[in-house]
Amino acid sequence: MSIFRITNILVSVLAVGFLLTGCVSKEKSAERLYQVLEKVVKAEKEFEEQQEPLVALEKEEKEIYNQIMALGMKQHEEIVKLSDDALSIIDKRRDHLQKEIDSINDSKTEFKKAEEIKNEIKDSAQKRKADDLFEIMRNRYKVHKQLAKEYSSALDSDKDLYLMLKNESISYDKLEAHVTRLNTTYQKVYDANEEFNELTAQYNEKKLEFYKEAGLNLEK
């Protein structure tokens, strides 16, 4: 019964600097929008900091699961000990997930301020670039919400799995059926992860395009 784990790190939005000296922005609102959009980056700093610890914990838990699968049921005491270790890791993963969610929510709050400024833009070319940018970010937030939901569901199923493994009388068929369902959930997590990273890459690209269209003198 192999178990599926995602090991991809979620990509964060990138900070971009520009030189105020010699800035040839067509509108002051572009400079104001820049300031707020870069606050969105800062709001996601904690989100970014959760990625490597989460992946490390996922790998650690996978190793524990493999150790359990290598043991016979006669070694029940060792299985219980390893399952408890895995349950502790699941709690840590849940803590990191909550910090990630909180950080994305802070990002949303800042982004709403940016939307108010965007609506003040008069230049049609800038407006088109900004509209594209904001549509991508709204989709990104939507995908992360779904991703977090699926990941939380996977954590619940992970917990159930190790509780089942601690039960000496659990049948192989029940374990196998549970692992199959769990892997289906993790496939959903993986798919949402991929979509989120793609949207983040698009957002970072469109943000640069907007800054250039607005005449902001970007730092190299």
Which positions does each model-derived feature cover?
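Short amphipathic alpha-helical segments with heptad-repeat character
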Residues: V41, E48, V55, R94, ...
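Bacterial N-terminal signal peptides that target proteins for export
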Residues: S2-L10
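Immediate post-signal-peptide N-terminus of mature secreted/exported proteins
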Residues: V24-Q98, K212, E219
